């Protein structure tokens, strides 16, 4: 059978995935372009929020969109505080790093391929300056649906149907 149309989903490591709307099976889908309209839940989740236009992060570089980073526990949401939060994943990546012999949360030499690497620079860092924790925090606080700037905001969701 020939497939004329399909949905294309993209997921990268510690990011929330994104999915195209129904597209031609032979079409090139550029998820970074604003011309590509990704699928979003809109108001269909019935949790009081409108996810229209929020399947991707449009505040990284003018004219482009990116995946939302920070899903360290890979549960389809980004969350800063307990339970099931992504911050603890970063914290324990730091504490358990093989070279962090004293178990310091402010360890500054944790290089490698770790879940808590928010900006994918090959280094995980929990305390200032230029740490992954505050990048995650800022993204959650300023997420467009987090109107009250809550650290325990629990509705930052991947917009791919299960």
Task: Please identify what each model-predicted range represents.
Residues 1-162:
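Cellulosome-associated attachment modules in secreted, modular CAZymes
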């Amino acid at each position: 059978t020939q497939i004329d149309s399909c949905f294309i989903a993209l997921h990268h490591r510690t990011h929330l995935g994104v999915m195209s709307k129904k597209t031609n099976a032979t079409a090139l889908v550029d998820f970074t372009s604003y011309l590509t309209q990704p699928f979003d839940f809109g108001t269909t989740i019935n949790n009081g929020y409108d996810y229209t236009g929020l399947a991707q992060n449009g505040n990284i570089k003018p004219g482009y969109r990116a995946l939302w980073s920070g899903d360290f526990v890979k549960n389809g949401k980004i969350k800063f505080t307990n339970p099931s939060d992504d911050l603890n994943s970063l914290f324990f990546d730091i504490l358990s790093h093989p070279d962090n012999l004293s178990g310091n949360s402010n360890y500054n030499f944790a290089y490698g391929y770790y879940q808590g690497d928010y900006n994918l620079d090959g280094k995980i860092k929990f305390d200032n300056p230029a740490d992954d924790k505050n990048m995650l925090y800022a993204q959650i606080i300023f997420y467009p649906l987090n109107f009250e700037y809550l650290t325990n905001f629990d509705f930052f969701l991947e917009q791919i149907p299960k």
